[in-house]
Amino acid sequence: MGIGGQNQVYLDLTHIPAETLDRKLGAILEIYEMFVGDDPRHVPMRIFPGVHYSMGGLWVDFNQRTNIPGLLAAGECDYSIHGANRLGANSLVSCVFGGFIAAPAAIEFAKNVQRNGADGSRIYDQELKLQQEINDKLIKQSGNENQYVLHQEMGKWMTDNVTVVRYNDRLKETDNKLLELMDRYKQISINDSNLWATMALPHARHLANMLELARVITLGALNRNESRGAHFKPEFPERDDENFLKTTIAEYSGEGPVFSWEPVDISLIKPRKRDYSKGKTETAKV
């Protein structure tokens, strides 16, 4: 239980000189003061956990190529820069490095592609038809489920059970809940006649993808019986390099994610514990 029984705790910055805060955190403090109404330079901030970053992403090879020929991924959408935790400024590194590698790889791929405009039009028309069929099916649904309620339920279960601290029994319960939500999703109703400018239809499409991805995250966590980076299991508090020094790969099958593993290359840099405690050694600081 947090402040006033809510999911909040205090973050006290009042001991830091206001000049220092303004220089280093000025924009953040202004936003906080605008929305909350308190000046964090003089009053402790009220904060709560939130998802700031998603570690992982599309699988790519060393040339930023996905498993789909011709589709490259660079920046925060690919997994390759991320480890078990996010390092500060990694977003910038992933964008710069990914773009540096992906651009020439894309040019090289394009040089060797047999150009056929007619074939491209056929593929486009085929995909357009498929997406329209999905939209039409959603629009015609007339069930009694509210997609926004499903979204809230999914968010609460994921926040409660699939953030940093994870227990296997709760992960199993969460996956069962996600399966329930996916079944209830079939009974949602768009309830919006203005389809030209509707936000309900795009949200419904996004929700379907979020439920799929939530299962990937939940089952991926369930499969990893160790603690590593931002993945902590009290039942398995130590890192297990013998069994889990590998990347989790999930493949879409239409009937739930299919998992495999890819070994992590540590020939140049060995994994080390990131230690924030007082009196840490110089090695731990690296």
Regions found by a protein language model. Give the residues of each.
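C-terminal catalytic lobe of FAD-dependent flavoproteins
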Residues: 1-55, 68, 75
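Glycine- and aromatic-enriched mobile tails/lids
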Residues: 2, 8, 53, 59-73, ...
